Amino acid sequence: MISFKVAPLADLEQHWQQAAEWSFEAWRHDFPSDTVQTYLDQYALARSKPEQLLEVFAAVTDNDQLLGVATLVHDDELPDALEPGPWLAAVFVTSDARKFGVGSALVNQVVDRARDLDYTRLFLYTEHAHSWYETKGWIKIRDTIFLGLHHTVMQLDLSGQTPSALQQ
């Protein structure tokens, strides 16, 4: 078992570089023009422009080791997206921390925050993890091709269940 907390990445600047490197590696096939600096700039924007919907959350251990990140964003850059947003985006958990509830905690934090902001729906798109999200109450709404790769677009209704009702 890993003991960890989820907090805004804006408050954990010591982890920005690692989070940016992970994000760049994880999604460079989807966003080939992005760089590590792209993510660092997003983290700075999230901290400096609270009026924009761009919030990044990080899971960190009690001894301040970064385990993963997840983002709540108005637009997740999916070309031709019909969905209005907001989006759960850029969920990443380091391989050593998987199967310990880190991903669930990060997703639940984003869901909580979207609900706090009075959104009634939340969207995501995923290349590989649609089955995992379905176990958390997300429903598939369509398939799409993005840069030649199949992705599943999903939605979570925020008006009914509370995050604590979502399965860990």
Q: Which residues make up each language-model segment?
A:
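Conserved N-terminal entry element of GNAT/NAT acetyltransferase domains
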Residues: 1-18, 159-168
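Active-site rim helix/loop that mediates acceptor-substrate recognition in acyltransferases
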Residues: 23, 28-61, 77
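Conserved beta-strand in the GNAT
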Residues: 56-58, 64-75, 87, 92
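A short, polar/charged loop-to-alpha-helix boundary motif
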Residues: 76-84
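Conserved acetyl-CoA pyrophosphate-binding loop and the N-cap/start of the following alpha-helix
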Residues: 97, 101-109
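Conserved GNAT acetyl-CoA-binding A-motif
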Residues: 114-126
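C-terminal "cap" of GNAT-fold acetyltransferases
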Residues: 125-129, 142-168
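Conserved acetyl-CoA-binding loop of GNAT-fold acetyltransferases
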Residues: 134-144
